[in-house]
Amino acid sequence: MNTVFMNGPTWGTEVFIPMEQVIGGQDMLGKGWKMLLECLSIGRSISLPALGTGAGKLASLATGAYAYTREQFGRSISEFEGVQEALEPLAGHAYQMNAARLLTVGMLDRGVRPSVPSALLKYRNTDLMRRAINHAMDVVAGRGVITGPRNFLARAYQAVPIAITVEGANILTRSLMVFGQGAIRCHPYITREIEAARDSDSVRGARAFDGVFYGHMAHTVRNGLRALLLGYAGGRLERVPFKADLEPYYRQLARFSAGFALLTDVTLLSVGGGLKARQRLSGRMADSLVALYYASAVIKFWHDQGYPPEQKPLVEWCLQRNLADLQDALRGAVDNFPVPALRRPLRWLVFPPGHTRLSGPDDTLGRTVAAAIVEDTPLRDALAAGCYRNENPDDSLGRVLNAYRLARETAHIRDRLHAAIRKRDEDELDGIALLMGHQRAELVNWAVGEGIVSEEEREPLLAALTALYDVLRVDAFDPSGLRELAQAAKGKRRVVERPAPQEPLEEPEPYPETGSYAVEERTADADIAEDEESRDPTA
């Protein structure tokens, strides 16, 4: 993918690995896969979710600044509603990705190994990263399709498939891992039922299983009644904290969590071990769990910061988006439930008639959220916290941020200039090519001479127009250099055939008195010394 990510097959011939180089020593031989899976829940909670969050922050910061500086028809494109539709999820996704990331690494800090949260976090954050980068490319448009040192999105765009694929491909994580594992590991009764069924003492196991099973049935009935009552009441029967005007969201989350719990129980009881083959159902249930998790993470993130009021539009956008996604995922699971006879009862329990009206954020809230990454406010700084920022005109990101600052500082001057140009006769301006790239100085001199711009405003205006033109330019390369680069790249790439499989070495006989194997004790230093000696022509 033309990205610095070392990934591929590894093989060797007569490779010797000293025992001291084996993780865990001799006791852990043959247990590498187990150790890998145990560590995966930790690494998967940190690396790729952080990558997705960072990419989302960068995309929102740079694209919001670019949208402000890019003008069309005499207006910033950030004022166009079509562009705002792309800027809106950029800001919202960056906010909720960061909230979910912090919630999950907080579990790691407490010594928890969150296998299910890490799986859904990796899946969702990398998926939102893909959406964010695609939205950013839509806004940047032609400015983003030429790869080169000026392009601040190309590398992130190229790296998206890697993040989607590694550490558990998203398509399998969604359809198999998140709900398939979570439904069993997180259920209050399933694990105990399995343990009772495996009990070597059949009498004791049957007695334990009966007690747990009846508790499971009562749990399912309670979930059904709770889902029905909360569904009809719109969650109003649930006691919720009265903080920061979030009561409606708490109630909807309580209502849908009851529906999710009921649907989980019914799925396990009716589908059982066939859940692995019902990957569409498992995927929709995973989407429901993801929406519940991210909505909870957003509320906690805002709470931990003390409910700053300027973040409320972003919080509401994230909650409304996740609740709408949660509703759609649960409805899809109910409408396509693999046992047709249960579809109508589940629909009445989870979605009482006339009590489902969630449609996601409206246009008014969307415009406010889009402005969060366009306007120079503390909210924009908070959203981009931790993101590398500079205003170096020779840097791909710094070029955009420098033009953004100069454009904001001279906005009133440029508005005055544009208004004067619109009022002038075309014949008067016929000798001036109003192209910022070619005759900026002539245009500024004309504006100063006409009294439109003062002498003190000349240099700031010229600097801003220069930066605004420079941020629009794409990279241009000499054809001969491109040809040499292509030939060099082609020459460095060579298809390597996989080595033929070798016969496994015969296992040595153990010593009869100890049962251990006769293994020559060697160290890495000894092997290095022997290798160097073999290459010494004088040896």
Predicted regions: what is each one?
Residues 2-506, 511, 521, 528, ...:
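Flavin-dependent oxidoreductase catalytic core characteristic
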Residues 514-517, 523, 533, 538:
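Acidic/Ser-Thr/Pro-Gly-rich, low-complexity N-terminal segments
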